[in-house]
């Protein structure tokens, strides 16, 4: 597929992957790879963008300010070298420190250990949910991430989510940022 891309720029949103698997952008063959830090247990408002140097040098910044400018005249603006070209204004220093700490934390735990623990919890949840009447676990025997989807007969998903929350069980209901898919299902 890489050979047939021509001028297409491939951006991968890796927010869901970074806390669960090692990511090799060279192996993926993407042009840009982004993730938000809160998916890696960092504070909100921080993330990372990796990009191929030649692409980052060509792309214009989307914001203006501070360190990103090398020269400004009435006739032209010359942007700073990367990465400063994309660093408009005062950086989110606290967020960057938090992201670095989160990366150290996850690295210290080890992605394999995290995956094994998630799998153990997922298996326990699936077995417990399968035993509940009027509850259907979708694809219970298919290997998957720690996300477990269920259908509850006769109960609206928001009501079920509220009841579980009152019992101290964290769940997510709604469209999960993919409303077209949910509508199709």
Regions found by a protein language model. Name each.
Residues 1-185:
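Pyridoxal 5′-phosphate
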């Amino acid at each position: 597929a890489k050979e047939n891309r021509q001028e297409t720029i491939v951006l991968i949103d890796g927010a869901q992957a970074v806390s669960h698997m090692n990511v090799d952008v060279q192996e993926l063959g993407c042009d840009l790879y982004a993730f938000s830090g809160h998916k890696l247990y960092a504070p909100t408002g921080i993330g990372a963008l990796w990009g191929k140097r030649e692409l980052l040098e060509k792309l214009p910044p989307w914001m203006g300010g501070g360190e990103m400018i090398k020269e400004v005249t009435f006739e032209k603006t010359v942007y700073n070298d990367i990465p400063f070209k994309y660093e408009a204004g005062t950086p989110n220093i606290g967020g960057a420190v938090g992201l670095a700490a989160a990366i150290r934390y996850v690295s210290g735990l080890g992605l394999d250990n995290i995956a094994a623990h998630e799998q153990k919890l997922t298996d326990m949840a699936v077995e417990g949910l399968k035993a509940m009447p009027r509850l259907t676990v979708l694809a219970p025997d298919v290997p998957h991430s720690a996300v477990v989807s269920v259908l509850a007969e006769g109960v609206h998903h928001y009501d079920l989510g509220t009841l579980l929350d009152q019992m101290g069980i964290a769940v997510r209901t709604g469209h999960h940022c993919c409303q077209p898919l949910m509508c199709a299902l």
